[in-house]
C-alpha cells in the first residue's frame, strides 16, 4: 500500500499548522502549550476521512524535515491508536515509499523501540497544559491494522460519511 501524505507540521516544530481544506492554504492553528516539539513530520493522508471527521493523520519518518504543504509518497508500517477529547484520533506511522534506505522497515516491530516510545510520549503529553484537552488511550498497532484503517478511511471519504 502506498499513498500521498500532505505534510502540515515539520519535525521539530512547536507551531501547529493545519491545511484549510476549503482554501488549500496552510493556517497556523496554535502554538503547543507544552515545551515539546513534533517528533516526526506530521500531516494527513489524501482522500481519507478519519473517525474524527478530518482526513486520517499520518506521521512520516524522514531523514530531514520538509515544509508544510509538501506531498510525500509514503507507505504505512504501523499506527498509533489514540483517543482524545474528540474521540478516536489515530495516526498512521509511515516511511518514504520507494526509498531503499527504509527497505528494512516493513512493520512496527522494525522501528526502534526508543523511537516509538519518544513518539508515544509526545502524543500522550503534548496537550497536557491546554484547557479542556486530553489524551486518554494510546498504543501502537501493526501494519496490517494500519492498512485496514487507511482502507476504511478511504471508503468513508468516498461515501462522504464518518
Swiss-Prot record:
Q: Name one GO biological process term.
A: phosphate-containing compound metabolic process
Cellular location(s): Cytoplasm; Secreted; Host cell surface
* UniProt KW keywords: Cytoplasm, Hydrolase, Magnesium, Metal-binding, Secreted
Gene3D superfamilies referenced in this protein's UniProt entry, alphabetically:
Inorganic pyrophosphatase
Catalyses: diphosphate + H2O = 2 phosphate + H(+)
Report the Pfam families cross-referenced here: Pyrophosphatase
In the UniProt entry, which residues are flagged as the active site? 89 (proton acceptor)
| Binding site residues for Mg(2+) 1 | 52, 57, 89
Q: Does the keyword Cell wall biogenesis/degradation apply?
A: no
Which amino acids does the record list as binding Mg(2+) 3?
84, 89
**Which GO molecular-function terms appear in the entry?**
inorganic diphosphate phosphatase activity; magnesium ion binding
GO CC annotation terms, alphabetical: cytosol; extracellular region; host cell surface; plasma membrane
The annotated subunit structure for this chain is: Homohexamer.
Quote the PANTHER family the UniProt record gives.
INORGANIC PYROPHOSPHATASE (PTHR10286)
Official protein name in the record: Inorganic pyrophosphatase
Q: Which organism is it from?
A: Mycobacterium tuberculosis (strain ATCC 25618 / H37Rv)
Instruction: Read off the lineage from the record.
Output: Bacteria, Bacillati, Actinomycetota, Actinomycetes, Mycobacteriales
